[in-house]
Amino acid sequence: MTGFPRISAARDSIVTASDPHPALGRTLSRIAFGSCAESSKPQPVWDAVLARKNDLFVFLGDNVYGDTRDPAVLAAKYAELAAQPGFARLRETTPVAAIWDDHDYGENDAGADYPMKEASRKVFLDFWREPAGSPRRQRDGVYASYLVGEPGRRVQLILPDLRYNRTPLTPMELNGADYDAWARARVAAGLPQPGPYVRNPDPKATMLGERQWQWLARQLEVPAELRLFASSVQVLADFTGWEAWANFARDQQRLFDLIRRKRASGVLFLSGDIHYAELSKLDVNVPYPLWDLTSSGLTEEWRVPTPNSNRASEVVADANFGFVDVNWRGDATRLAIGIVDAGGETRMSWEIPLASLRAPA
């Protein structure tokens, strides 16, 4: 995380250190987030982001489109992002935290078998100015957790790594047919376009890897009023064939069960990846009603949204970012969440009582 000089790295062995920033010690009340930023394209969305004067901005992955096994090429893509005027202003004025997804990991839909993952990890951590002594540099991946604020107003930011240890995806069987041609034909016929994968039935398949699962269990024991779980792919969307937690149904349920077992209140999922924005909700087989606010992309757009039976909103298919505003009022604290387009218009918004995100005693 850049911007906060000393933030508790929740249940880690050290405290992360960074350059001094005037936001130090402030309660987090205005948080923005986004994903999917093509560094070679204009990025006018930053004007709208900056106008909000956020306490924190969270990058959810595909922060650049590297798609390369050459670390020098990947670093050059980050240099393009750094040269974007809006991004540069963001970095100067607002604390930033980041996780990666496949395209800044290095290859489309890649997981644990990606051979250049260590090189990509170094490029990622260097660009986001991770301190040399950070626990993040010692882990099997780039996952991290931060705790900001005083008791009664604590925000925990959980950044899981959904690439470094993830089991390879299981391709759809098309009897030799080409997926791209098959998908184009469906779209031309006005039909939804399922993704190219099926659920992985292997009981040993994993999203996080066992070491990261144990780390996550410890994070959910840390006292916090609000937990922002920043997932690079959707957590609550039902299975569509595209990348999501639903590709690994056992791990998806394991996540919900872990939240229940740890009595971890205040979880709100933030996600990206899909090139449109939506809100998903799940209230079956979960410890309390769970929400997943998806914002995608900062530059990228997709006009054919996939069916999602857990969708609780319309779809915004224009460039966008998401926000979480917290009105801290003790037991009456409320979250205002929503989606803003590149022109600064709030396209969707909702209010959620923080007390509704409370695990049963």
What are the residue ranges of the model-derived segments?
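Metal-dependent phosphoester/phosphodiester hydrolase catalytic core
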Residues: 3-361
